[in-house]
Amino acid sequence: MRPAIRIVPALLLVGVTAIWGWTFVVVKDAIASYPVVSFLGVRFVLAALVLWLIVLLLRQRGRVALAGLTIGVVLAFSYLSQTLGLKGTSVANTGLITGLFVVFTPIIDRLLWRVPSQRSTWLAAGFAFLGTALLTGGAPRGFHLGDLFVLLGSVGFALHITLLSRYAAAGPLLLAAWQMTAAGLLLTAGAVLTRSTVLPAPSSVLPALAITGILASAIAFWVQTYAQQRLPASRAALILTMEPAFTVFFAFLLAAERFRLLQAVGATLILLALFYSELRQRAAIGAAAPVLAPSTSEP
């Protein structure tokens, strides 16, 4: 794919990470008065309803139910594992371990689909993970049982990215709709089984549910699926590491939280990893392009 064409899905994915970073600030207050699993369940059910409405309006058809439901199960598992882990470990550990998805993605890509990993991919992933570590507070603060759940969630997020890149071409809208359906139903079932309050949600939480359900889930996952049909999984994972950078930025801008020097360095490392990856891919495309010898024949 030519660089000019590839930059559009990359920018769309950057936009998705910006939305997720912004909504993290919105969600923070909402889950203080509403169970996390219930919030996630209602959020994804709302997203599924919005996407199915769009599917009906656009009269979309396709045989992607199995792939979409499978990806949705992986997504629900990832969120549940991360949420369970967060209850048993620190926020810093959660952010740091979750950031390992950028390392796990090329590994899973190679194991499942035999996608070769270049040295530049690993170098960029290393820089991005180091940047994530600085953004989330540096070194882990001791080992907790919750860390294992967060680690499983990180593997799940990496698998989610690789599956999207593999099956997104089958139909981004339908795939996103089935994905939200599976995730919403499973997370809602999880909330019911844990006897968490699902409905009615507190009125103070409704704006956050609407924002995250429609914008950060229905639209964002649709756009992510569309973008990943044109991006390799390892490239998508690198771009998605920008989410904590946007979270810190919007927390500083909207919630008056302090922006520390280490966080600025971390955000810079993530950006450098993205630029390095882009330059290496452009160089690889240029080297692979055929060289046409000038014609010596007269017209």
Predicted regions and their residues:
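Transmembrane alpha-helical segments that form core, pore/gating elements
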Residues: V25, A47-L51, T105-I107, L111, ...
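Specific transmembrane alpha-helical segments of multi-pass solute transporters/efflux pumps
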Residues: I19, T23-F24, W52-T98, P106, ...
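Helix-helix packing/entry segments at the starts of transmembrane helices
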Residues: G41-V42, L80, T94-L100, L163-L185, ...
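Transmembrane alpha-helices of multi-pass small-molecule transport proteins
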Residues: V8, A32-F77, F104-I108, G156-H160, ...
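C-terminal-most transmembrane helix of multi-pass membrane proteins
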Residues: R2-P3, F44, G137, V205-P207, ...
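Hydrophobic transmembrane alpha-helices of multi-pass small-molecule transport proteins
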Residues: L51, V73-L75, S117-G137, G153-F157, ...
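C-terminal transmembrane-helix exit sites in multi-pass transporters
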Residues: V50-R59, Q82, F101-L123, A245-V265
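Juxtamembrane helix-entry segments on the extracytoplasmic side of multipass membrane proteins
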Residues: A4-A10, S33-V37, G41, Q60-L66, ...
